[in-house]
Amino acid sequence: MSQQHTLPVTLSPALSQELLKTVPPPVNTQQEQMKQPTPLPPPCQKMPVELPVEVPSKQEEKHMTAVKGLPEQECEQQQQEPQEQELQQQHWEQHEEYQKAENPEQQLKQEKAQRDPQLNKQLEEEKKLLDQQLDQELVKRDEQLGMKKEQLLELPEQQEGHLKHLEQREGQLELPEQQEGQLKHLEQQKGQLELPEQQEGQLELPEQQEGQLKHLEQQEGQLKHLEHQEGQLEVPEEQVGQLKYLEQQEGQLKHLDQQEKQPELPEQQVGQLKHLEQQEGQPKHLEQQKGQLEHLEEQEGQLKHLEQQEGQLEHLEHQEGQLGLPEQQVQQLKQLEKEEGQPKHLEEEEGQLKHLVQQEGQLEHLVQQEGQLEHLVQQEGQLEQQEGQVEHLEQQVEHLEQLGQLKHLEEQEGQLKHLEQQQGQLGVPEQVGQPKNLEQEEKQLELPEQQEGQLKHLEKQEAQLELPEQQVGQPKHLEQQEKQLEPPEQQDGQLKHLEQQEGQLKDLEQQKGQLEQPVFAPAPGQVQDIQSALPTKGEVLLPLEHQQQKQEVQWPPKHK
């Protein structure tokens, strides 16, 4: 019985420990055991199925007492049954542990299946939010860009008005003749203030000097007022930088507009434009260097002015030591020296304004050069179109030359037909061996309908090749434009090519004149001579003179 109910289940100890850790606490195992009872022998069916793992000794005694009347073999079987039940319980426990070890994977799968839709929903919501945020940011950026463009378009107008106002102020700052006279008067007064050596011992100033000092104070007030006006007129550095930046942006916008209007330029023009851009960049670099040099020159002028002021101060201190002037006059003299340095500052500002005017002139010159470039580009496009027409004409001429022989064959066919008609009228006896040869030659000379269509097409092309008077006058204009834009070697090659085309056209006209000449009817004795002159397969057509000579030599004798 024990061999029938035991099943071999082997699990590694490591797996069993891991599974026991992860698996939740087991459900009542006794209920599952009740569902699947083990079969027992008939005398022992009254025994309870539920047995603990460790059977106490008291139960064994009870079992022994309950089954006293049975034979010893049955009692031994009953004693072995608890052991079998214990083995079955161990087996069921192992089986349950194995099932529980498999269940976590299923639980994980179920949890994943439940979590996946939730995660997908969350991701979709987050994506929607991000899309909305991006759309809002794009709208904001577009609005900001539109505002900036409007501001940039409005700034030049404001700055133009500001520049006009500055120019008016500059006109006001130009000192009139009266102020120049006042400055000269001040210099004279300074000269008068330098007292001679005789007045060294005199400390008290006369009444005239006191009046002069009052006059100097009034002039100092006027100079301060002028300084205040100059301070208002000084353009801040930020506005200057904004003006330069706006000019650069305007230049870039013009350049982009021109690029959009212009077609794709050839490689040569692209190189020229790059070279021009480099040249345009060079003036800016030179302007920066000039500005630096001017700044250095201004600094040198300031240093020289300071040295002069130091020399004047030393001279004044020497005079003060001699004259013993009070401290108030010393301060007044220093203020006068400062006021004299202000006109130089105004002159420097005027020089900067002149420099800006020169830069504007240079920009206008560059704009004119760009317009010239556009005109050159248009001329080059016209030249390319005309060159394409010339190439098309060359191809047509070559095609005509190839098919010129077909016309010659047609003319020979016409002559043969005319000769055949004359033969029929004259009743010349036909030779016996000639009909087959004549039929072969006629088959060779019969042109298909395709050749006739080609001849018609050639006639149309010849009509197109007849250049009108306007096209005859165009090559001269083209030659002048090509001399301006192309190197001399290319011009020589194109002129030679045009001369060759003219020569080919003249040759075609001569051939037409020859073909239009009338065909004379031969005498009765010469009818068969012309038939023998027709070329067979492999022979080459010869001029008419050589053919006539061969006809006289190769004429076969008549059969009587």
From Swiss-Prot:
One of its GO terms (cellular component) is cornified envelope. Residues 76-91, 189-211, 321-334 have a biased composition (Low complexity). GO terms for biological process: keratinization; keratinocyte differentiation; peptide cross-linking; response to UV-B. The keyword NADP does not apply. Transmembrane segments: none annotated. PROSITE patterns: INVOLUCRIN. It is found in: Cytoplasm. InterPro entries: Involucrin_CS (IPR019743), Involucrin_N (IPR019571), Involucrin_rpt (IPR000354), LRR_dom_sf (IPR032675). The keyword Cytoplasm applies. Residues 1-15 have a biased composition (Polar residues). Keratinocytes of epidermis and other stratified squamous epithelia. Directly or indirectly cross-linked to cornifelin (CNFN). Belongs to the involucrin family. This is Involucrin. The gene is IVL.
